[in-house]
Amino acid sequence: MKTTLELLKHIREECDFLLSESKNLDRDEFLDSETLRRAFSRSLEIIGEASKNIPSEFKKTNSKLDWKGMAGLRDILIHQYFGVDYELVWEVVNSLIKDTKVIIDDLVNELD
C-alpha cells in the first residue's frame, strides 16, 4: 500500500504533466488531438484514484483541496467509456490544476 506522501507525489506528477502539456495549447488543438484527450483524461483519472486512497483523517486536516471532487471526476471519467466530455477535461485542466498543484506541493513539502 502506498503512503500518503507517495500518493501526493503521484498527484503532483500528473499535475506537472497536465500543466506542461497544456502550457502552449489552445482548446481546439486539445480537442483535435486524440492522443492529448486520452492522456489528459488518464492523468485526471490517476489524480482521482490517488485522492481516493489518501486517508480520510489526512483529508480532514488538509481540507484546502476538493478531495471529493477529484475522486468524483475520476468516477465520471472511468465510467463514461464512450462519452467522455473532453470540454470538461479541458476546463478542469485550465481552471483547477494550477491551484491544485500549489497545494499539493505544500503538502508534499510538509511530509517530505
Predicted feature residues:
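Solvent-exposed interaction patches of small proteins and small membrane subunits
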Residues: 1-112
